[in-house]
Regions:
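Accessory carbohydrate-recognition regions in carbohydrate-active enzymes
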Residues: 20-192
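Bacterial N-terminal signal peptides that target proteins for export
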Residues: 1-7
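Bacterial N-terminal signal peptides
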Residues: 8-16
Length: 192
């Protein structure tokens, strides 16, 4: 009798050990806005731990509080950088910047007080979405939807342009963060 009870008990234990537990999604606990305001200097955008790239918006820098490229108090975008430092308190990287545009643009950063200066655009917090590895917003000046994503080695950008014959993407190799600038860069055309 003991043997008969013992076998079903072992069978039940083995069946329980074989079932796989559903892994918990810890990304639901991430608040990507922590540290993005005041003196936090934390980067906002699409990145993953120890990733090669950090894609995200770059605002018009006003003080050293913008040294990560983003400050929650600001709703301007001058481009989407592919390398950012986070939490350092000093500007660096952000050297490769893409800015989707529609129509005639004035190259350069411009100033937040003058909408006709530079190629910058405003965005709305209502349109902004950020999660681990993902960032999205809408450029109000151009009507362009922006989505950025990152993996450990690669970043991807997707731009949804309105119907236009005059849409483009500006590649800014002179971009830098705050007082930091690229000093020696260029483009070499390898083929047609």
């Amino acid at each position: 009798m003991k043997r008969i009870i013992f076998l079903p008990a072992i069978a039940a234990l083995l069946c329980g050990a074989c079932s796989s537990a559903v892994p918990e999604d810890y990304t639901q606990y991430v608040d990507p806005y922590i540290g993005t305001g005041d003196h936090g200097h934390v980067f906002m955008g699409a990145n993953v731990p120890f990733g090669f790239v950090q894609l995200g918006p770059t605002s018009i820098p006003q003080t050293w509080d913008w040294c990560s490229g983003y400050n929650y108090a600001d709703t301007t975008v001058i481009g989407f950088g592919h390398t950012h430092l986070s939490g350092t308190g000093i500007g660096d990287l952000n050297d490769i910047s893409l800015m989707p545009v529609v129509g005639k643009v004035t190259p350069g950063r411009g100033t937040a007080g003058d909408p006709s200066s530079g190629m910058w655009s405003r965005f709305s917090r209502a349109d902004e979405r950020c999660a681990p590895g993902y960032y999205a917003t809408r450029l109000l000046r151009y009507g362009i939807g922006v989505e950025l994503t990152a993996s450990p080695r690669v970043g991807m950008s997707r731009y949804a342009f309105p119907a236009s014959d005059d849409a483009g993407i500006v590649l800014d190799l002179e971009n830098g963060q705050g007082w930091d600038r690229s000093t020696d860069c260029g483009i070499t055309a390898c083929s047609d």
